[in-house]
Amino acid sequence: MHVKKSMGGQFVKAGQDFKDGDILQILDEGRLDDSGDFGPKMVFQVRLPNEESKNLNFNKTSMNYLIDAYGEETLEWKGKDIKVWIVKQMVSNKMTNVVYITAPGQQIEGME
């Protein structure tokens, strides 16, 4: 059986490490993680409100918002602030908290 090594390091927990509306900071250029059930995603190390740093998955929607704000080169995102949005959504037939990420001045469509 072919297995892939999963991404190392501690991952953030929405609602514990940060809350809706918090401002975090991107600390690296990110890396692609194709483990898991929902396809490839970008993982960035971020600085949390308590000054700790942990890994955070950026979904495709979040990536698109950040590309609009900061450009297509993730190396240039290092040191940039991001705003986290925690939204209850139906995922795999159950309500779950989904984290979206934008630049601080951006709004999520439908969340104005």
What spans do the regions from the language model cover?
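Short nucleic-acid-contacting surface segments enriched for D/E, G, S/T with interspersed K/R
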Residues: 68-83
